[in-house]
């Protein structure tokens, strides 16, 4: 039990702080005697429900109902109540900090100890309950391989064996064909479906001009060769003898001008004929390819 002087000191300290109900409730718990019941504490000094803050209403209701959790901290707090009360009264009255009392004051405040929640034996913390449900994404993702169902070993075994043999043979034939094709040259079959007449005309004109020069070179070579052999002189003498016997004018039948003049005339005619014939041939080929198809051509690599 407390003396009247201590109760007056408590009231003066409550007036100085402005929150007397909170500290009064804490001091009332600290100065309680172990043999005194909770009903006696409520009759002697019971705070009003409106004076206490919300976070201490639960502790006040628990003290009124008579429920005391079995916490070892509460027993140690009740064993040494008097020194804490004296230190608090001195601190509130004088306005100075209380001296450090080693071994007398507990490490935690009584008011804060009363507010600490006590976990039941079957209660699991919030983080532990949800940590087990979360998947572990720190390691590599394991991919499950679908298992193939084993075939039934019964009447279907010979059929399955035959199917496997045919599949193996088919794959072997395909591999042999691919290997043969890979070793041999690559071939491609195509059809020439259309030829442009204008392009054909240009190509034929170029080729005919080239052939004209080839023709003229060939004529000059033959003329020189036959002249060296004396063919043209022999021919001219024979022709002159025939004309003299008949009473005609004798002259040279074969000369340079006559030979090269005739060669140029023949070459020009060949150019015109070859160019026109190539253009006409391209036009006819396009018509025939539309009717019966074009010429098939096989393209292949070098052996």
From Swiss-Prot:
It is a multi-pass membrane protein. One of its GO terms (cellular component) is plasma membrane. Residues 1-89, 132-159 are annotated as: Disordered. Its main location: membrane. It is found in: Cell membrane. Keywords: Cell membrane, Membrane, Transmembrane, Transmembrane helix. The chain crosses the membrane at residues 205-225, 264-284. Residues 61-89 have a biased composition (Polar residues). To M.tuberculosis Rv0007. This is Uncharacterized protein ML0007. It comes from Mycobacterium leprae (strain TN).
């Amino acid at each position: 039990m407390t003396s009247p002087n201590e109760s007056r000191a408590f009231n003066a300290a409550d007036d100085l702080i402005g929150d007397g109900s909170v500290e009064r409730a804490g001091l009332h718990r600290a100065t309680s005697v172990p043999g005194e019941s909770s009903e006696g504490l409520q009759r002697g000094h019971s705070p009003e429900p409106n004076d206490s803050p919300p976070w201490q209403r639960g502790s006040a209701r628990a003290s009124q109902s008579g429920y005391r959790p079995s916490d070892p901290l509460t027993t140690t707090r009740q064993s040494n109540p008097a020194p804490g009360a004296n230190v608090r009264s001195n601190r509130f009255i004088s306005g100075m900090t209380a001296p450090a009392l080693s071994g007398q004051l507990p490490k935690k405040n009584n008011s804060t100890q009363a507010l600490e929640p006590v976990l039941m034996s079957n209660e699991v913390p919030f983080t532990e309950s949800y940590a087990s449900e979360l998947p572990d994404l720190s390691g590599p993702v394991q991919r499950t391989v679908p298992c193939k169902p084993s075939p039934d070993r019964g009447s279907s075994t010979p059929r399955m064996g035959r199917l496997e043999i045919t599949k193996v043979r088919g794959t072997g034939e395909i591999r042999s064909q691919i290997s043969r094709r890979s070793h041999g040259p690559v071939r491609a079959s195509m059809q020439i479906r259309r030829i442009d007449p204008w392009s054909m005309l240009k190509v034929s004109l170029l080729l005919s001009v080239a052939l004209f020069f080839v023709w003229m070179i060939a004529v000059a070579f033959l003329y020189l060769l036959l002249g060296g052999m004396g063919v043209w002189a022999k021919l001219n003498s024979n022709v002159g003898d025939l004309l003299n016997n008949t009473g005609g004018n004798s002259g040279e039948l074969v000369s340079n001008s006559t030979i090269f003049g005739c060669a140029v005339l023949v070459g020009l005619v060949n150019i015109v004929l070859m160019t026109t014939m190539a253009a006409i041939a391209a036009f006819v080929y396009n018509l025939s390819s539309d009717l019966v198809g074009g010429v098939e051509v096989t393209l292949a690599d070098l052996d």
